[in-house]
């Protein structure tokens, strides 16, 4: 079915793919993106692991109402999450050679 050495080659390829995925996950965890809201007046720096590393709020907003600042922070966090997802999808696409996965399925399985 697999031919001469086919099964061994298949196992070797699977192991190499697993190693590349591990390396890619490490790179993604180290990656940082910046989400913005309010024309850059609120910025959220987020790691590829989705942990928030820093929140910057322009001094001019400190005189505005609390609710507006909270809304802008939430919008900036959501923007950062979206950017992490886009970068992760792009990097994983490079790894898988553009192989499309079923909706909702993420790597690693």
From Swiss-Prot:
<feature type="compositionally biased region" description="Low complexity">
    <location>
        <begin position="11"/>
        <end position="23"/>
    </location>
</feature>
<comment type="similarity">
    <text>Belongs to the YbaB/EbfC family.</text>
</comment>
<dbReference type="InterPro" id="IPR036894">
    <property type="entry name" value="YbaB-like_sf"/>
</dbReference>
<comment type="function">
    <text>Binds to DNA and alters its conformation. May be involved in regulation of gene expression, nucleoid organization and DNA protection.</text>
</comment>
<dbReference type="Pfam" id="PF02575">
    <property type="entry name" value="YbaB_DNA_bd"/>
</dbReference>
<comment type="subunit">
    <text>Homodimer.</text>
</comment>
<keyword id="KW-0238">DNA-binding</keyword>
<dbReference type="GO" id="GO:0003677">
    <property type="term" value="F:DNA binding"/>
</dbReference>
<dbReference type="GO" id="GO:0043590">
    <property type="term" value="C:bacterial nucleoid"/>
</dbReference>
<protein>
    <recommendedName>
        <fullName>Nucleoid-associated protein ASA_2087</fullName>
    </recommendedName>
</protein>
<keyword id="KW-0963">Cytoplasm</keyword>
<feature type="region of interest" description="Disordered">
    <location>
        <begin position="1"/>
        <end position="23"/>
    </location>
</feature>
<dbReference type="GO" id="GO:0005829">
    <property type="term" value="C:cytosol"/>
</dbReference>
<feature type="region of interest" description="Disordered">
    <location>
        <begin position="87"/>
        <end position="109"/>
    </location>
</feature>
<dbReference type="InterPro" id="IPR004401">
    <property type="entry name" value="YbaB/EbfC"/>
</dbReference>
